[in-house]
Amino acid sequence: MAQIPPSLQDMVNRFNQAQAQLQSVLLRKQQYEAELKEVDKAISEIEKLSPDAKIFKNVGNFLVPQTRDAALQELKERKELLELHVKTLSRQETMLREQLDKLRDEINKELARLKGGEAAKGGG
C-alpha cells in the first residue's frame, strides 16, 4: 500500500481518539473507586463509635470538631455522589468499548478491501 486513503486515515484517527478517551475514563473511574473504598472504610469506622464520640474533620490546615451524625451524613452523601460518578463512567466505558470494536471492524474491513483490490487498482 503506497498511500493510506483519507477515509481509512479518518477511521484510524477516530479510533485513536476513542482509545485516548477510554484511558481517561478508566483512570477517573479508578480514582473514584479508590475514594469510594476510603469513604466506605470511614463510614464503617465511624458507625462503630458512640454517638457522643469526638470526631474531627480536616479543613485545610485545621481540624474542626464535628458530630458523629454530621460526619456520617457527609460521608454518605459523598458516597452517593461517588457511586453516581462510577456508574456514569461505567456507562461511558461501555459505549467507548463498543465504539472501538465497531471502528476496529471498519478499519479491518477497509484494510481487507484495499489489500484485495490493490492489484486491480495499482496500489491506491
From Swiss-Prot:
Top-level division of the source organism's lineage: Archaea
Pfam families per record: Prefoldin_2 (PF01920)
Record-level Gene Ontology MF annotations: protein-folding chaperone binding; unfolded protein binding
GO cellular component term of the entry, any: prefoldin complex
Subcellular location: Cytoplasm
InterPro entries (alphabetical): PFD_beta-like, PfdB, Prefoldin
The keyword Chaperone is assigned to this record: yes
Keyword terms: Chaperone, Cytoplasm
Alphabetical list of Gene3D superfamilies matching this protein: 1.10.287.370
BP terms from Gene Ontology: chaperone-mediated protein complex assembly; protein folding
Membership in a protein family: Belongs to the prefoldin subunit beta family.
Quaternary structure, from the entry: Heterohexamer of two alpha and four beta subunits.
Purpose of the protein: Molecular chaperone capable of stabilizing a range of proteins. Seems to fulfill an ATP-independent, HSP70-like function in archaeal de novo protein folding.
Protein name per Swiss-Prot or TrEMBL: Prefoldin subunit beta
Organism from which the protein derives: Pyrobaculum arsenaticum (strain DSM 13514 / JCM 11321 / PZ6)
Taxonomic placement: Archaea, Thermoproteota, Thermoprotei, Thermoproteales, Thermoproteaceae
